[in-house]
Design a protein with these regions (language model features):
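C-terminal-biased regions
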Residues: 1-69
Length: 69
C-alpha cells in the first residue's frame, strides 16, 4: 500500500509540473476516509485522474504509473 509520505512526494512532483489542483487533491486524499480500503480506492481514482493530465513530465508520469501498478 502507498504511504502518506509517498503520496506527498508524488504531489510535489505533480505541483512542480503545474497541476496544482491535482496536487492538492492528492495531499488531502485522506480527508474523510474511514478505512484502508476506502483510502486505497480514493488514491487509485486520484492517481488515474492525475495520469490523464497532459502537463505531467515523463518522470512524474513514470513515478505515478509505478504506484498505479
Amino acid at each position: 500500500m502507498i504511504t502518506v509520505e509517498r503520496v506527498a512526494e508524488l504531489a510535489s512532483y505533480v505541483r512542480a509540473d503545474g497541476a496544482d489542483q491535482l496536487a492538492s487533491d492528492l495531499e488531502t486524499a485522506d480527508a474523510g476516509v474511514f478505512s484502508g480500503t476506502e483510502r486505497a480506492m480514493k488514491l487509485r481514482f486520484l492517481l488515474a485522474a492525475t495520469l490523464r493530465d497532459e502537463r505531467l513530465s515523463a518522470s512524474t508520469r513514470t513515478a505515478i504509473q509505478t504506484e498505479w501498478q
